[in-house]
Amino acid sequence: MAESTFKSGFVAIIGRPNVGKSTLLNRIVGEKIAIMSDKAQTTRNKIQGIYTTDNAQVVFIDTPGVHKPQNSLGNFMVKSAFSALHEADAIWFVVDASMPRGRGDDFIISRLNEVTETPIYLLINKVDLIAREELLAIIESYQVDAPTWTEVFPISATEGDNVPELLDNVVSHLDEGPQYFDADQLTDHPERFVIGELIREKVLQLTRQEVPHSVAVVIDKIAREDEEKIHIQASIIVERPTQKNIIIGKQGTMIKNIGTRARKDIERLMGDKVFLETWVKVEPRWRDRPQALQTLGYNEENY
C-alpha cells in the first residue's frame, strides 16, 4: 500500500472590515485566536491559525481589515494585510453577502488583480442573512473587473455552513509539504499575545465608539502560583484620560466587567483557574509614535 502524501501551505484571509474573517478563522481552528467585535479594525496583526488533519496542515493568516489609514497604526495594519498576499499559497477574499459591493471591496480587488498564479477564492460570507434567490446576483456583482476566481464558496462562518467543504477544497489545491507545527498547536503567537487579544476583545465589546481604536493591551506578568492557578497582570493602554475614565467606569464597574469576561475566556484557553489584575494607563498619541507601536507589539519584523 502506497504511503499517503502530506500537504501543507499558507492561506491568507483578506477582506474589508467586519466581513467575518476572524469569525471564520475561529470557526476553523475551534478556539478564540482572532478577536471578534462589531467594531471595525479589530484585527491588528497577521494572526496565524493552524488547522491540522492526518494528511494536511493549513496555516491561516488573518489580516487586518483593509481601510483608509488615519495614523501610523492604520498604515501598519494595511501594510500587514497586503504583505500576506506575497506569503500565501492560496488567498481567501471574504465579502459580506448582506452588504453591496463597495469601494473597499474594489480596492482589494484591484490588488488581487496584481496577483498571478496563486489560487484566489471568493467567499460569500453571512449567507444565513440573505434569501437564497439573492445569491446569484451577489456572485455576479463580484465578477466585474475582478480576477478569475479559482472557486466561489457561499458560507456562513457563524453557523459553519459549507466551511468543511471549503477546507477540503483548499487542501486539494495545496502541494505536498512538511508539517510546520505540532498537530495540537493552534497558533504561532505566544500565550501573552492571545491573552492580550482576549482582554482587548472585551474592551471593544463593552466600551463606546471613541475608545476601541485607541486601545492596546500589554501583559505585564504571567506567573503560575500553584498547579491549578495562574496570576496574570495586564495594562490596558489608551490615549486620553477621558478614555481611561470610560474603561474604569463608575466606581470601577466597567473594568470589573471587562476583567470578569476576559478571565472566563482565558481560563478556557489555559485550562486552569486565573487571577486577572488589570490597570488602565494613558499613553498620549501612541498610535502615531513608532517607538510606542514597537513597544506595544506592532513591529513589522515580527509579522
UniProtKB/Swiss-Prot annotation:
SUPFAM superfamilies: P-loop containing nucleoside triphosphate hydrolases (SSF52540), Prokaryotic type KH domain (KH-domain type II) (SSF54814). GTP binds at residues 15-22, 62-66, 125-128. InterPro entries: G_ERA_dom (IPR030388), GTP-bd (IPR006073), GTPase_Era-like (IPR005662), KH_dom-like_a/b (IPR015946), KH_dom_type_2 (IPR004044), KH_sf_prok-type (IPR009019), P-loop_NTPase (IPR027417), Small_GTP-bd (IPR005225). One of its GO terms (molecular function) is GTPase activity. Keywords: Cell membrane, Cytoplasm, GTP-binding, Membrane, Nucleotide-binding, Ribosome biogenesis, RNA-binding, rRNA-binding. Residues 41-45 are annotated as: G2. Residues 207-284 form the KH type-2 domain. It is a peripheral membrane protein. PROSITE patterns: G_ERA, KH_TYPE_2. It is found in: Cytoplasm; Cell membrane. Residues 62-65 are annotated as: G3. Monomer. An essential GTPase that binds both GDP and GTP, with rapid nucleotide exchange. Plays a role in 16S rRNA processing and 30S ribosomal subunit biogenesis and possibly also in cell cycle regulation and energy metabolism. HAMAP family: GTPase_Era. This is GTPase Era.
